[in-house]
Design a protein with these regions (language model features):
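Catalytic cores of DNA base-excision repair glycosylases
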Residues: 2-219
Length: 219
């Protein structure tokens, strides 16, 4: 009986975490995403460029990139050196430019249509699970839970996982989060990690989850 009671309390704690995050950061996954894009292809490219780069800087770059090359066909035909020049501010510019050009060519071969399933997305050049989950949840509004460094950190601090493996964390969270809330949870954890639960100096005093968090630092 005690085990069942403990399990019920933990379930209620997790549901309350979801509720408070949704109250603090309202909106759909598309509304919560801070990357700027006009269609699934542009989000795919922006997400590739966002690796180890801020969304703000990516948006500055993609405004220029997409004004010149708004579609997969246009970007696939772009001069590689010109693409490298444009994406330079995002870091790792040669690798990112190469991936962007390859994925653009692959999407262009599909008639400009970005696939909407994990199986098909991860077959595209330079696309892993995190990028695929962003596209699935944000562009298509389907269940998907991107796991970045913020999601890893907050999931561990909140006692939602003991793992540091993004794939395992994704599976653990998806095992109890309602599918329709999965993308929103990921983005809310990311926003909370950027604004409150920072890596080095978490602001526990102003955190709406402090009383639910086993890692909270007492004031």
């Amino acid at each position: 009986m005690a085990g069942r009671a403990g399990g019920k309390r933990e379930f209620e704690r997790r549901r309350e975490i979801l509720r408070r995050l949704a109250d603090t950061y309202p909106g759909s996954a598309r509304q919560l995403c801070e990357l700027e894009f006009a269609d699934p292809f542009q989000l795919l490219v922006a997400t590739i460029l966002s690796a180890q780069c801020t969304d703000e800087r990516v948006n500055m770059v993609t405004r220029d990139l997409f004004s010149r090359y708004p579609s997969a066909d246009a970007l696939a035909a772009a001069n590689p050196e010109e693409v490298e020049r444009i994406v330079y501010p995002t870091g790792f510019f040669r690798a990112k430019a190469a991936n962007v050009l390859k994925v653009s060519a692959a999407v262009a071969e599909r008639g400009g249509e970005v696939p909407s399933t994990m199986e098909e997305l991860v077959r595209l050049p330079g696309v892993g699970r995190k990028t695929a989950n962003v596209v699935i949840s944000v562009a298509f509004g389907e269940p998907g839970l991107p796991v970045d460094t913020h999601v890893v950190r907050l999931s561990k601090r909140l006692g939602l996982t003991l793992s540091g493996d993004p794939v395992k964390i994704e599976a653990e969270l998806m095992s109890w989060v309602p599918p329709a809330e999965s993308g929103g949870l990921s983005l809310r954890l990311i926003l909370h990690g950027r604004r409150v639960c920072k890596a080095k100096k978490p602001d526990c005093a102003s955190c709406v989850l402090a009383d639910l968090c086993p890692s909270a630092i007492a004031p």
